[in-house]
């Protein structure tokens, strides 16, 4: 059914946690948003990495019972998909203009306004982390905090530019072929998860490969083009007074970029958690490693797991509830760095 705001709401009870899909029209195209939970609760916005959506990027985290109890008890979840990355998406018309990273960040504001949201918590992975960070820099008053997984903040390096160019050509001529999926799995996961001649590919990688089969090559190409043209936002990070929790796998190709971002942000507002034996997508590969740092991080907003605090939050969160002590690096989890976790061979 179409409403007066120009969005179509579709019941998708069989899709991820029984959420509801809203298709929100923005200046840069239609955006799919899966909403799950009580909309009177504070909002948690998620944004996935290249070629992924909420099913392939955040399912592991939200299916982790401890993390789910922490996040779903305290937030209403708004899973935003990059244009054309939602489940069952058709190919985007080639004549449609290709959005820039800034256009995608502006879409976030339009989504928030459509749902009538004020300040929100944001969680993004790699390319999605860049989009949400850019949004926070442009609209600081709308962002309560950032939870970033393997984030980007600089313009592409020569090696990343070359890597992206190879994928671009493959997508253009062959679509989501096997070679493209192999490149993407290298982007997402550690060697242990991807497997080799001696170690079989893990269930996580196999599931991701199947979900990548559903992506339209032209749609992935458009998002890749936006990310490949991204500007360096490092200088703006120094002015971003926003509490930020960064996770990075020690086998991620973006490890040095995440460390650079953490070093650039104000130490009083940022904590970096390194996860051992893990690639970029910590949300899928080692979601349990995120639990304790997130608990410490959210305690600064008076949010707890149900076993610790039974009341359900109903009012918008405000940074004013944060005591100065909770803005110290120690209170934000730096004592937990690095997280010593290992993956056992399947």
Curated annotation (Swiss-Prot):
It comes from the Eukaryota. Expressed in root vasculature, cotyledons, leaves, petals, mature stamens and pollen grains. Keywords: Cytoplasm, Growth regulation. It is found in: Cytoplasm. Interacts with the heterotrimeric G protein beta subunit GB1 and plays an significant role in GB1-dependent regulation of lateral root formation. Involved in a signaling pathway that modulates root auxin transport and auxin gradients. Acts partially by positively regulating the auxin carrier PIN2 and AUX1. Acts, together with GB1 as positive regulator of meristem initiation and branching. Belongs to the NDRG family. This is Protein NDL1. It comes from Arabidopsis thaliana. The lineage of its organism: Eukaryota, Viridiplantae, Streptophyta, Embryophyta, Tracheophyta.
